[in-house]
């Protein structure tokens, strides 16, 4: 469960934990999942780059000049470019991937970035009671807002599983699209694409 609280509403912010021992125990319990989130997210980003190479070139290793551009692109730009390339293939009839599957994939890729950023930029040392962590601070016309997310080992494991499974889903979609473009039978089935 997330909570968004105005900075000025001090009384409504979750209380910080009482002891260093409590903080240390919590961090020890969740550190492995944080690491897996970073590892799987980085792998997902690499997979997106590989898919871009394959969508743009006949031989992904033929022209390393593309890597000059990919190295300068952030995750969101790479993900959006890949989704647009898939959309172009659909629009021109080269792929029969259902538009809703593409929309769902785009949303999932965006959600993966939000999850990863929440973990990467969270105030882990500022742990609050009931496992609330400040994951985002933003400025609005109403003042500064802090977003807290309850992250216990179970939630963290669900986030690990989501990002890990998204990479497999992307591989399935990519194989399906490429096989449709080049007229080859796919080894992936529709359930792989949707999950």
Regions found by a protein language model. Give the residues of each.
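Acidic, Ser/Thr/Gly/Pro-rich intrinsically disordered interaction regions
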Residues: 2-39, 50-76, 80-195
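N-terminal signal-anchor transmembrane alpha helix
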Residues: 45-49
């Amino acid at each position: 469960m997330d909570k968004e609280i105005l900075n000025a509403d001090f009384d409504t912010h979750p209380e910080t934990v009482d002891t260093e021992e409590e903080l240390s125990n919590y961090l020890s319990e969740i550190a492995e999942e944080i690491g897996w989130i970073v590892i799987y997210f980085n792998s997902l980003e690499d997979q997106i780059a590989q898919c871009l190479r394959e969508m743009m070139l006949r031989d992904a290793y033929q022209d390393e000049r593309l890597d000059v551009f990919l190295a300068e692109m952030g995750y969101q730009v790479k993900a959006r470019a890949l989704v647009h390339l898939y959309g172009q293939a659909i629009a021109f009839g080269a792929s029969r991937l259902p538009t809703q599957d593409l929309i769902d994939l785009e949303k999932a890729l965006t959600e993966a970035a939000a999850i990863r950023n929440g973990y990467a930029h969270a105030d882990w040392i500022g742990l609050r009671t009931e496992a609330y962590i400040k994951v985002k601070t933003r400025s609005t016309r109403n003042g500064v807002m802090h977003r807290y997310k309850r992250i216990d080992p179970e939630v963290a494991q669900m986030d690990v599983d989501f990002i890990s499974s998204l990479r497999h889903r992307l591989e399935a979609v990519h194989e399906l699209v490429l096989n449709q473009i080049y007229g080859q039978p796919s080894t992936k089935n529709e359930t792989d694409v949707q999950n």
